[in-house]
Amino acid sequence: MFLRHCITFTLIALLAGCAGFGSREALQGHGDPQQWRAHKAQLSSLDGWQINGKVGIRAPRDSGSGTLFWLQRQDYYDIRLAGPLGRGAARLTGRPGGVVLEVANQGRYEATSPEALLEEQLGWQLPVSHLVWWVRGLPAPDSKSKLTLDGDSRLASLDQDGWQVQYLSYTEQNGYWLPERLKLHGKDLDVTLVVKDWQPRQLGH
């Protein structure tokens, strides 16, 4: 069960690279489209961050919660889970072309992509590269999305590839307004993320 929890969240949290975003968006809500575009352009410049927070997972057969540490440096990631989510700790590291999952007292798992590792370990197909965008309050650029803006022209919710993401609150860090509480709902899976500490960075290319 622990491995199931760890793979579920950490693989959703992976990326396929920080490419530029397209215009496959359907906008609605109370925000101003021009302000949204400016906000999106600012957030897309972030290619590094450190996050500390909590994550909860609900699935038909099991559920749990734990602490999250996520270090992102361009295309390199280091994601760690610990606490009641399982009986130990998990660490996921890698970059495009190579992913390593280490689970305390259970083993080490490798794949060429997070999608491949998820498919191999669980047999699930999920948009695992999207959360690197969603966690910043952006839609993933490679598929269509339906966006609802709040009164501050930030995302209140988005629908993309069969997932619904709700943005419950934001926090301001270093001039960036970033999601603080998110709820993600997919087929047979709900994920709640509460960010306690955001440290955004622009590392350059």
Swiss-Prot record:
Record keywords, A-Z: Cell outer membrane, Chaperone, Lipoprotein, Membrane, Palmitate, Protein transport, Signal, Transport
Gene Ontology CC: cell outer membrane
Subcellular location: Cell outer membrane
Residue ranges that the Swiss-Prot or TrEMBL entry lists as coiled coil: none
Domain of life: Bacteria
Gene3D superfamilies for this protein: Lipoprotein localisation LolA/LolB/LppX (2.50.20.10)
InterPro entries reported for this sequence: LolA/LolB/LppX (IPR029046), OM_lipoprot_LolB (IPR004565)
Residues bearing a lipid moiety (N-palmitoyl cysteine): 18
CDD domains associated with the record: LolB (cd16326)
Keyword Transcription appears in the UniProt entry: no
Chief place where the protein resides: membrane
Lipid-conjugated positions (S-diacylglycerol cysteine): 18
GO BP term, example: protein transport
Membrane topology reported for the UniProt record: Lipid-anchor
PROSITE patterns linked to this entry: PROKAR_LIPOPROTEIN (PS51257)
Signal peptide segment: 1-17
Keyword Membrane: yes
Pfam families in the cross-refs: LolB (PF03550)
Subunit comment: Monomer.
Record-stated family: Belongs to the LolB family.
Known role: Plays a critical role in the incorporation of lipoproteins in the outer membrane after they are released by the LolA protein.
Protein name: Outer-membrane lipoprotein LolB
Species the sequence originates in: Pseudomonas putida (strain ATCC 47054 / DSM 6125 / CFBP 8728 / NCIMB 11950 / KT2440)
